[in-house]
């Protein structure tokens, strides 16, 4: 029971984070590009909006899975996908930051990405019973 509550919190937290990120990327692409110092070229705007669509899709997948059992063999594909997403995102953001690209967007994203990567990794190796 306690594990179900913990994974419900994990799914809710990651869904809300990805939903906020997805809405921002989908509806404010020019503003986000300006914040990062990137030009608002049409193809970059398109890539930002497509990234937002993917974040929204991921958010709804996590949100709709909140009532399911996680850990061990239960919902392993979704757990692995979340581990891969947040771990890869964390490494990418940390790599950018160590290369000297430390701005508000990186700082705002790196903390939740690292926390969620570790949380999902823990869910991957935790038994639900």
Kindly label every feature range from the protein language model:
Residues 62-75, 97-98:
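Juxtamembrane helix-break-helix junctions at the cytosolic face
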Residues 8-10, 21-46:
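Membrane-helix boundary elements
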Residues 36-45, 74-77, 101-111:
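Non-cytosolic membrane-interface motifs at loop->transmembrane helix junctions
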Residues 91-108, 124-125:
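Membrane-helix boundary connector in multi-pass membrane proteins
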Residues 115-129:
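Membrane-water interface at the C-terminal end of transmembrane alpha helices
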Residues 19-24, 44-67, 80-90:
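Core segments of alpha-helical transmembrane spans in multipass integral membrane proteins
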Residues 8, 15, 52-55, 79-86, ...:
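Residues within membrane-spanning alpha-helices of integral membrane proteins
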Residues 1-7:
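Short, Lys/Arg-rich, polar N-terminal cytosolic tail immediately upstream
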